[in-house]
């Protein structure tokens, strides 16, 4: 746009009107960047190699961790609401978690623009760092019932993280709380399932499937539980898609080479595709 021929003061007034009276002076006010702490966020990328493509690799993983932070925020709150029997807020939170997984599924397409040649250039600079060591991802798995105490070991060098993950390991999962809620509403769940060690993780239990079957056979009677069950299925469905896209992205970039963290890479990721978080909810579909 051509400079306005009027005075500076008049120009400033015209400019403010042109931008629909948007605030333009933040000398004494909080700006967008101030609120989001963008100076810190955008100054947290430190490539170790001289290669152009490492920035993509860093930002891909940093943004994934930010989405996982939100996911944990929602899952922790949803679990508390289920525990207290307040399913309305929990259902909304679980729907949001599913959409976060969908967001992360689409994000793999960006990393997939990195070719094997490009990745091989930066791989020597990564050391043994690996997504396998993500403590936020580990807590997500624990909240969803996929628990294994051995997976605490990569965090033993960080006392505060280890303590938080140990607490997550021994806290009943979201699914544990859903099962307890069914029992509280009079559905027949075995006492053994209700008092089992929370750190043991989820495994199939016949009485739980029987209870869920009653919910599905009489949804009008157990409408909130019926909705909860479907939200859990939605969540695991999206999680499975994320895992599958993870496998295919890694395979197209590194093939079947070992991962930087020492795992079998694609072989390990493929084995995780067989993980079932809510087994009774899936099995009952064959038995309805």
Curated annotation (Swiss-Prot):
Homotetramer. Keywords: Dioxygenase, Heme, Iron, Metal-binding, Oxidoreductase, Tryptophan catabolism. Binds 1 heme group per subunit. It comes from Pseudomonas aeruginosa (strain UCBPP-PA14). The lineage of its organism: Bacteria, Pseudomonadati, Pseudomonadota, Gammaproteobacteria, Pseudomonadales. This is Tryptophan 2,3-dioxygenase. Heme binds at residue 246. PANTHER family: TRYPTOPHAN 2,3-DIOXYGENASE (PTHR10138:SF0). It is an enzyme of class 1 (oxidoreductase).
């Amino acid at each position: 746009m051509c400079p306005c021929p009027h005075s500076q003061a008049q120009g400033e007034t015209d400019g403010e009107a042109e931008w629909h009276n948007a605030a333009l002076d933040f000398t004494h006010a909080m700006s967008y960047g101030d609120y989001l702490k963008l100076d810190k966020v955008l100054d947290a990328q430190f490539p170790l190699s001289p290669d152009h493509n490492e920035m993509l690799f860093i930002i891909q993983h940093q943004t994934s961790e930010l989405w996982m932070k939100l996911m944990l925020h929602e899952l922790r709150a949803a679990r508390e609401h289920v525990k207290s029997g307040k399913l309305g807020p929990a259902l909304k939170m679980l729907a949001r978690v599913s959409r976060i997984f969908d967001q992360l599924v689409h994000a793999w397409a960006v990393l997939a623009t990195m070719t094997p040649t490009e990745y091989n250039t930066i791989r020597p600079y990564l050391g043994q760092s690996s997504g396998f060591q993500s403590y936020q991802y580990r807590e997500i798995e624990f909240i969803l019932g996929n628990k294994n105490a051995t997976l605490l070991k990569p965090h033993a060098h960080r006392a505060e993280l280890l303590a938080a993950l140990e607490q997550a390991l021994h806290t009943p999962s979201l699914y544990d709380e859903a099962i307890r809620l069914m029992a509280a509403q009079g559905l027949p769940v075995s006492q053994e399932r209700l008092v089992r060690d929370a750190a043991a993780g989820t495994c199939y239990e016949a009485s739980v499937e029987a209870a869920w079957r009653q919910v599905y056979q009489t949804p009008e009677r157990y409408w909130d539980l019926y909705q909860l069950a479907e939200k859990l299925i939605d969540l695991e469905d999206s999680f499975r898609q994320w895992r599958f896209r993870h496998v295919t992205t890694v395979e197209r970039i590194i093939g079947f080479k070992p991962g930087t963290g020492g795992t079998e890479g694609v072989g390990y990721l493929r084995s995780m595709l067989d993980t079932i978080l809510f087994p009774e909810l899936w099995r009952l579909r064959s038995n309805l």
